[in-house]
Amino acid sequence: GVVEMFHEKQRRGEIPKDLDITFVMVSGDGGMDIGMGPVIGTALRNHNMIIFEYDNGGYMNTGYQLSYTTPHLAESKTSIVGPAFAGKSTFQKGTGTSTFHKDTPMIMAGTNIPYIATVAESHPLDFVKKAAKAQYVSKHEGLAYIKAISACPLNWKSPPEEQRSVIGTAVDSCYFPLFEIYHGITTLTYDPNKSNNKIPVASWFKRMGITKHLLEDDYKEEMDSIQKEVDRRWERLKARSEHPLL
């Protein structure tokens, strides 16, 4: 609404024609859960703006309830961990009744907006380049969507001084891959395999108190399932980057 009000006031002469503003809507992963309907509407109308999502995997400002991007089987205030549970939506161990994290960039890709990107502060140059590209797109082509992985030391139960490193581990495990989609063409902007930095998801999970329980022998089957899903998504993403028609 603010974007359209601005352009209408410019048309009427109430705002100078040469006033140049970049409109950015900032949302957490919780806002992208609750506000997914309006976000999709914004995408389908292709408004000239940027949607910037910072994803810390939970509803943190209300005490850390799980969101749809909370790591699979992670502990939260609404996902119990203990002998009968393995986290995430009161998952009862052995039943497999929980879900994997929501792939919001691919949801946005389905709306065919001009530009989609993922970023991480562990890779600052990549971050800045994509932010500049998103600004250009928002001024000349329509909607740009950027998703950043964002640390929450308090609720992740990991030391604040290690957060950039923890985020980098998520990227190197391909749990949070770095890529962009511009007019339907997918480009991997960082491939940990090429720099011999590829690591298993367990290497990221062990850095956070909310997922450490998954490294215990009792959860081997669940951990294998998580790794398989992350690998599946990574291989699909690589295939998209290698074949422009995908």
Which positions does each model-derived feature cover?
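Active-site lining segments that contact anionic ligands and/or coordinate catalytic metals
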Residues: H140-L143, F176
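Short, hinge-like loop/turn segments at secondary-structure boundaries
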Residues: S67-P71, E162-S165
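Thiamine diphosphate
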Residues: G1-Q65, H123-A134
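Flexible, low-complexity linker and terminal segments
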Residues: S150-L246
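Conserved thiamine diphosphate
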Residues: P16-D20, T70-V137
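Beta-sheet entry/capping signal
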Residues: N48-I50, Y115, L143-Y145
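Short, conserved beta-strand edge motifs with alternating hydrophobic and charged residues
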Residues: E53, T118-V119, Y145-I149
